[in-house]
Design a protein with these regions (language model features):
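A short, Lys/Arg-rich alpha-helix, primarily the initiator
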Residues: 2-27
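Short basic helix-loop element that most often maps to the first helix and adjoining turn
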Residues: 20-38, 63
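Conserved hydrophobic/aromatic packing and binding residues within compact polymer-binding modules
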Residues: 21, 35-36, 46-49, 77
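Short coil turns linking two alpha-helices in DNA-binding domains
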Residues: 31, 42-45, 59, 73
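Recognition helix of helix-turn-helix/homeodomain-like DNA-binding domains
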Residues: 40-56
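Short, basic-rich loop-to-helix N-cap that marks the start of a DNA-contacting helix
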Residues: 53-68
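Short C-terminal boundary/hinge segments that cap the last helix of small helical domains
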Residues: 71-82
Length: 82
């Protein structure tokens, strides 16, 4: 089992991922409710993912589902600045 290393703070990366998802969702003319329904999560969960400064863990599977629903490559959702 992997031991959690508390020396890393990924808040900014989660924020960028959330911004990316929101950007492509809006570009697809979808509401949070519509996208959430397409990928099988609650609107509140999607809202938390898109919210700035919220460390909302999301699975790779969910990233793939969101990317497919938005018709974008998954890497575009997780592309973050180093």
């Amino acid at each position: 089992m992997r031991k959690k290393n508390n020396n890393y703070d990924h808040t900014e990366k989660y924020t960028e991922i959330g911004y990316n998802i929101a950007y492509y969702r809006k570009h697809a003319n979808l509401t949070q409710e519509q996208l959430a329904e397409l990928v099988g999560i609650s609107r509140a969960h999607l809202s938390a993912i898109e919210a700035p400064k919220v460390n909302r863990n999301l699975s790779v599977e969910l990233v793939f589902d969101i990317a497919e629903a938005l018709h974008v490559d998954a890497y575009k959702l997780i592309k973050v600045r180093e």
